[in-house]
Amino acid sequence: MVNFFQIALVLIGSTGIINHVIIIPMLLDHSGRDSWISIIILSLVYIIWIPCVFIVHKYTREEHLFSWLMRNYGGFITYPLLSIIVLYLIILGTVTLKETLTFFSFYLPETPRILLGVLLSIICFYNIQRGVQSIALTTGILLPVVFLLGFFVMIANFPHKDYSLLKPIMEHGMDPVIKGMIYPAAGFVELIFILFLQHHIGSKIKLSQLIIVGIILAGITLGPTIAAIVEFGPFVAANQRYPTFEEWRLVSIGKYIEHLDFLSVYQWLVGVFIRISLVIFLIPDVLQVTKQKARNQIISILLICMVIICILPISDASFYWFLSHVFLPISAIGLFLFSMLLLVFVWVSKNKKRA
């Protein structure tokens, strides 16, 4: 068992890699200069949605979510939902690994992608098979350094920031603002993972704690988005594949120390390590596979399949289109609808017991 603080760090580290890095170019593509407004408006909606997650947690009584569904609604409802969640988690892990191999191709262009994929998979496998405690402990050790580096790059780049680039506000009306909201939403709704992990949490979860995690997730999305706009301008930032990490290229210490962007590699690796470990751990966990040998076999097969898919000759443009137009919008809408469905199930179950 782990406590809520540890799980919160895992969720922040996992969701941070998508909201801090992956969604920002797509958000800038659709909302441009007003991307930061999209995040602020969405964050207000997000704070309203978080109590829905808490209500589901409260009335499932810290039981395994899918055990609760099976007990109350049977396999006819539970198995289709479980299948969709498992498929979503597999795609999520594959997308994360694919993005990682693309990012590392900038730094290690001559290194075979399969080698990088296998090395990362081996490290993640070792972490996953040791359980949620291992994932939580490694996150607690690695993530604070990521936060420190984030504050460092923010402070170091103050001389390069021009906040006048945030204006004019809503030059093209509300339409671009609304279009961009779907991308940070894809990361925000991953807070629902707390329900998949609730049977591993030994401490009581409070609504205020979930709201604090939500505010942190909103902050780590808003900060780099504003930074990209004020440092590069909305048009240049939108043309960059990873504007968050391009910010590291601006960092220098005095006259003689620069090219510190290698530190971004640590940030990325930590985020990906946490995210892949969490996502792949959840698959046998939601399937309630208890035997360690069977769990290890499932984890191994999943990681091997992910590496094979990631080294297929798929262009980055096609992959970017898939993320932007298919996966992220479906993820955001799908997880939101899933949370609403759980809320309905909880309400019906509660009224049945009263009757």
Curated annotation (Swiss-Prot):
Localization annotation: Cell membrane
* Family, similarity comment: Belongs to the amino acid-polyamine-organocation (APC) superfamily. Spore germination protein (SGP) (TC 2.A.3.9) family.
Keyword check for Secreted, yes or no. no
Native source organism of the sequence: Bacillus anthracis
What InterPro entries does the record tag this protein with? Answer: Spore_GerAB
Q: What Pfam families does the record point to?
A: Spore_permease (PF03845)
Residues passing through the membrane, by range: 2-24, 34-56, 69-91, 106-128, 135-157, 180-197, 210-232, 265-287, 299-321, 326-348
Task: Give the chief site where it resides.
Answer: membrane
Keywords attached to this entry: Amino-acid transport, Cell membrane, Germination, Membrane, Plasmid, Transmembrane, Transmembrane helix, Transport, Virulence
Name of the protein in its database record: Spore germination protein XB
Task: Give me the disulphide-bonded residues.
Answer: none
> Translocase: is it a keyword of this entry?
no
